[in-house]
Amino acid sequence: MRLADVDDIRRVAAGEDFPRSAAFAVVIGGALASLIAVVSLLSTLKGLPENAKALHLGIGVGAVALAWALVHCVFTLRYAHAYYDTDEQGNDCGGLVFPDDIGKDDQDKLTPNYLDFAYFSFVVGMTAQTADIGISSRHIRRTALLHSLISFLFNTAIVALTIGTIGGMLN
């Protein structure tokens, strides 16, 4: 992804539109399965030797971190697809306004790459806001709303899991 240029992103966006409902199911299912597995794993901590506890905790933290990153990576691809999808005239749909583009003509505007979409995705996921990138399309606005809600629920579950784990270890 890091080495892909804009033409690569356009080609992928035109050729592969993973259905939204399937993407949603994969992301939510994967994140939920990860949290359930971590809860199951951490429920076995009592009575384990210290080195085994550390291993279980490490695996649990790693699984949650990877599931959290997966959510935002999938939304990175959705934002890229939505941006480089074409309208009836064959132009990019766009929908995100980058700070570098303010006051510039269309031909001088930034052609975002995956890192730009990843930046947007992770900012939405971590802060539930868009920071310095504006949204100018209804489709991306709805995607960002869904992303924010999923991220809020996932982040809340992580906080609850952390508090429960710490509470269980202190008893």
Predicted features, each with a name:
Residues M1-V6, C73-D87:
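Membrane-water interface of transmembrane alpha-helices
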Residues A13-R20, A52-H56, K109, I140-A144, ...:
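Membrane-helix interfacial "entry" motifs
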Residues S21-I28, A54, G58-G60, F117-F120, ...:
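Alpha-helical transmembrane segments of integral membrane proteins
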Residues A23-Y79:
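Long, highly hydrophobic alpha-helical transmembrane signal-anchor segments
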Residues Y83-D85, Q89-G134:
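Membrane-proximal soluble regions of multi-pass membrane proteins
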Residues D116, F120-V123, A131, I135-L170:
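Pore domain of cation channels
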